[in-house]
Regions:
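Conserved internal alpha-helix in NAD(P)-dependent oxidoreductase domains
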Residues: 12-13, 28, 52
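NAD(P)H-binding glycine-rich loop region in Rossmannoid oxidoreductase-like domains
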Residues: 1-17, 21-24, 39, 121
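Oxidoreductase cofactor-interface core, primarily capturing Rossmann-like NAD(P)-dependent enzymes
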Residues: 40-146
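SDR active-site strand-loop-helix element
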Residues: 30-36, 68-70
């Protein structure tokens, strides 16, 4: 984003504006990706910003709010910073050491997170739900509902 101000504008202000417009348009379910460790009281700017977003969203009033909280996103993309490249190479090995309560910090493929977002829309559950590593993996496995075709 270039600066903390720009990061907050993109990751909080624009997401909240979009959520408000969606709610005004009668959208009943909202799915958002934040981060494992998101906390509005965190000292870390990134985690605090994500936590502030999480804290603000329930007040908008969606029937269903699904908060996806992945660890580091891994995978290949066109433009990769050195940090992203290192994560994509070493995180799959590092994941093996992240067990028990630390499992939530495992790196996860961006495609898996995208599938989990779609899966969240298929649960039919109402309320606010947070999903970390295992929950994201489970949501990603929910198959699409069969389409009904006319004719």
């Amino acid at each position: 984003a270039g600066s903390q101000t720009e990061f907050r504008r993109v990751d909080v202000d624009l997401v909240l504006a979009f959520a408000r417009v969606a709610h005004a348009a009668k959208v009943t379910r909202f799915v958002v990706v934040t981060s494992v460790g998101a906390d509005a009281a965190a000292k870390n700017f990134y985690l605090r910003t994500k936590g502030e977003l999480e804290a603000a969203l329930p007040a908008i009033g969606f029937q269903s709010l699904d908060i996806i909280q992945p660890g580091p996103l891994i995978g290949w993309r066109r433009e990769m910073r050195p940090k992203d490249l290192a994560l994509s190479v070493f995180m799959p090995i590092g994941n093996l050491a992240l067990i028990g309560k630390r499992e939530v910090y495992r790196g996860i493929a961006a495609k898996t997170v995208a599938r989990a977002m779609l899966g969240a829309t298929r649960t039919g559950r109402r309320g606010t739900y947070r999903y970390t590593y295992q929950g994201i993996q489970q949501l990603a496995q929910i198959p699409p509902k069969p389409e009904f075709r006319n004719g």
